[in-house]
């Protein structure tokens, strides 16, 4: 960044913002880069501002029992705030004085006041000076207030972030990520630009009092008639606003529904295409969109009438103000024109400035109190440790994760007089407190000495992770004693990668030791991986390590933990994403050798690990099931395998037990036993969803973290009703959310309290920060080119009879995200608060975009032409009326000099001729007609623009759904979703009304200039250069401002990225003590954004000031042209000066509106880009290499037409297949060929990332491919994409359950009857589950089917495949995250329902391969072997290296008696009781 010219600028340059000229000039001539931005002033640095506010807040906390954040802010910023407020007041006072001078100038042209004609020149000079003074006062004041608002936001940003890093885990469990993001975006954005309005809460009343005093002097009591009109107008606008908010609230729910479905579809686009559901999904979304648009139109009409009421109310205010005076004293032109000027200022103060100021204070005070409450939340308590301790001891520890339990626990401890703390060893000891709810850990005791390895095992939710959190101090024990040295290193279950290089992620701020670093790299098997990167360990990793595979992330996370020199290493399932060979090597070299002298606690379920551990702790439902050595385990606990692997799963419960479990599950999600309204009529069968839907989805839509959640179906804890829900208690303020677009999911969505009518739940489930920290990212398991292709390895979701650990983490069963869904779209700030990915677009919108936008809907051109015609009629009528009135009044003035009385003011002129009154009445009639025409002009325009938005959404949705997968591999998911959320919100809400305002203002200005020029032709000559100056200034500023806005948006992204990253790795940060380092990184991100935002504010003020300076010059010319060229008669000079004075504000408004239109049209440009995306049908398919198959295409096409039941056999031939994820990218599969016979079962083998999933995607034509694949002799070049994919049944890694009923999820096209659906549900084991839900098949699943276990969701996919009656079944690790029982159900179904089908299976488990006849081994992008299992075991292969002796025994039982005799395929009975070894998770 460059040094800012502001530091060496003089007073003149600062006053006129001339120091911004270099950046404006550079932005006009070339594209701006981040290096072109100026450094921020020292006073604006986040370090200084946060330190200042933190000091005052600490002072407030120390001095008072009831601290107030507003007091801390007052001590920091009050005096500067008041100084700029005083400047603003003085600038506004000049507006009230200007009409006085105008009245004197008009009066001087009365023939009776000829002796004052010479004073007119001085009055004109005074009027011009008032404009100059106002310009010099107003702009520095507004800029200063914006600057203070920016500083307040920065200081509060920092304060909130620092507090976030200190919050206790219990508090984090009750605060959603959406709330935190909302605190930093929704609430704090109010300070930036809103602070300039704050002073109008006292300026506007003073101004009204001053204006009413002046009007009283001019019109006496009739002045209050105009004020009464304004009060009525304000009440009318308030009523319109209330009506509009009702429509918007109802519409917000519909927007949520549409965006939920859209987000789910985009996030699962591979599944949508694999199932050929594009048309069904498109119809579903468009149906929701139609309902949404009906409410959008109603809300837009309300806002249109609100805006129009302001524009057209001016005439009635003036007319009713002067009417009583006119009827009693006659028409006095001076009074009329002076009243017009007074009323314009009065109208702005009453209807705009004061309401806006009140709203700003209301919102800001509410935001301050919310931030204050947040800053007073319970903090993470650092336990006191004994550094000389070498052992790790836990004695009789019991702890709770219960939701809403934090405050209860604190109060209980405070009130427990028997609580004692040992002063000897400074360890925490807690006494018994009787509380309801099952503890997550119950009476846990163990002791491990230095250098020992403790293996912690147990089923899902047993309390393994909670045990580690207890040791780290994240979970505070209710009772018991913990003892260790406190020097801890930690590797989380779901690897956390911070943005930075590989080296930075491993060293993580610890002092660098080359030898230790290299040893750790080698032990964690990272040497080969790092050597493949061009930059080696200096390769920069994106947020979450998106460019790495899940295994690579896991190893880097483990290396980070091992590199730190600690006494105790906590390793939470570090091998979850590794293939079995890598896992064995790392366990031996790293855990057993490199860390041999260190105390280690390893969470694992592998038998090999348990055998080598010094001590074993098996947890079951939070209790210690076993503690001791492995040799004791088999003797004392022969049933340990079921506890270890979660064999107590849902499917083993009796029917009565299952029924009670499901009933309890449903009860937790309903306020009462009644059903709520739903998406459609069938949704009445659903449980109560009101108020929960938006909260659940706010953390899943456009999700930068789009997690794979860990649920258990069963939770026995009672529904907590005291969960934090700030949104229920807060005022119904307008909100918006800001999520970084650098995240894979980013956008702002409207949030609604209601998906359907009904009461709001007091305890709405939301995604807690704790949940965010305890589940993987969407990218876990995916590689650089397999973006999102491999799901994270998830824990088994076997339900527990009591609330499990993972249940407690995810007790709200919500999908996660860092996104707050706003209740409605914030009209004022929406366009400012979205970040978008870096675009290589021009700095201004092209004319082609405008032309295409206007011509996409035929009626829009007609409406625009109608607007032009109505405008011409209005201008013509105005000219005729004004001329008649002016001339008539002038003639009467000359003949009525003797008719005035001495009781009137000495310069007043009374017009008593009756014809003049007729002229006035005619003018009133013309004005009423023009008012009606104005309403007629705007309403069709708004309606047509919303219709354009509808058409654009239809076209874009169709294009996206039909786009090839290569498009989705190159685009961020968030970028796509932003088009449907951010840009469609702009097209629906902001753009129509902004275009209307711009056209309305432009026509007003043109009309006023036309009238003034017609009355005084010389003024037209003066207006030409002024118009040219405006156009040039706008073009000059627009190029730079749009680039600065784009840079500012890009700079805003790291702030929220860093927040979410910090939250995800908060436990790691605390374990490593890196809070200060991350605070510094956050301040760096804040400073970067501040530099861009401050420069934008400065250049904006430069432009506004230049616009006003040009107008002041224009007004000076108009004033003196009028004074010098006007003879006797008040009419002409009155009209000219009044219109010229009031053109100023309108013209500035119009220029700003034009800039807003240009900015908003960039959304239209982005939408057009998506509309123009290529479609799959037109994507060329490359022929097989060295093969000319064109000669048989005609025959095959004819065959396809004849064979209606193709494919009939399922025989596949793959020839020279090459597959890539990106055009021009590396080949993931390179020139492979093989064939599969009809009905054959083939297993795919290979290490993680070898290309097994890629091959399945290639079969479905989801990748860029070359070569040929034939099914039953038909080439894929001869069959349309949709028909080709229908030949396959698919069970993907990533289960796709969209928000809809069971029926829709199984049969979105409605092809099957209920009987057929029930038959298939029974066949796959889902019938008993579906029957437990109200409505059964019509029960509505939301949020990815969170009420179902992962196994049940997998069975849904299996049911779809059965219904598809496909001849070829593709299974991509279907058992990766299943409990053993559900896995056996799938095996049974595959065996029975797909007997005659070709099955291609990618698996890690040996058991899953038992039914396969042949195996395809993929290594280094090629097919290495394609043989039977017997041949593979006789040859050197990955399979032979990975398989253990016990695995061979399972595959070949006879081998134990006679190794020379082998079975070609062992017989397996469904749901057989497996032995201890069979239960093991054996992976390849």
UniProtKB/Swiss-Prot annotation:
Residues 1388-1484 are annotated as: Interaction with GORASP2. Pfam families: ABC_membrane (PF00664), ABC_tran (PF00005), CFTR_R (PF14396). Residues 654-832 are annotated as: Disordered R region. One of its GO terms (molecular function) is ATP binding. GO terms for cellular component: apical plasma membrane; cell surface; chloride channel complex; cytosol; early endosome; early endosome membrane; endoplasmic reticulum membrane; membrane. Residues 1473-1484 have a biased composition (Acidic residues). Residues 1463-1484 are annotated as: Disordered. Residues 81-365, 860-1159 form the ABC transmembrane type-1 domain. It is found in: Apical cell membrane; Early endosome membrane; Cell membrane; Recycling endosome membrane. Residues 1-77, 147-195, 244-298, 359-859, 944-994, 1039-1099, 1156-1484 are cytoplasmic. The keyword Ligase does not apply. Its EC number is 5.6.1.6. It is a multi-pass membrane protein. N-glycosylated. The chain crosses the membrane at residues 78-98, 123-146, 196-216, 223-243, 299-319, 340-358, 860-880, 923-943, 995-1015, 1018-1038, 1100-1120, 1135-1155. PANTHER family: ATP-BINDING CASSETTE SUB-FAMILY C, CYSTIC FIBROSIS TRANSMEMBRANE CONDUCTANCE REGULATOR. Binds and hydrolyzes ATP via the two cytoplasmic ABC transporter nucleotide-binding domains. The two ATP-binding domains interact with each other, forming a head-to-tail dimer. Normal ATPase activity requires interaction between the two domains. The first ABC transporter nucleotide-binding domain has no ATPase activity by itself. This is Cystic fibrosis transmembrane conductance regulator. The gene is CFTR.
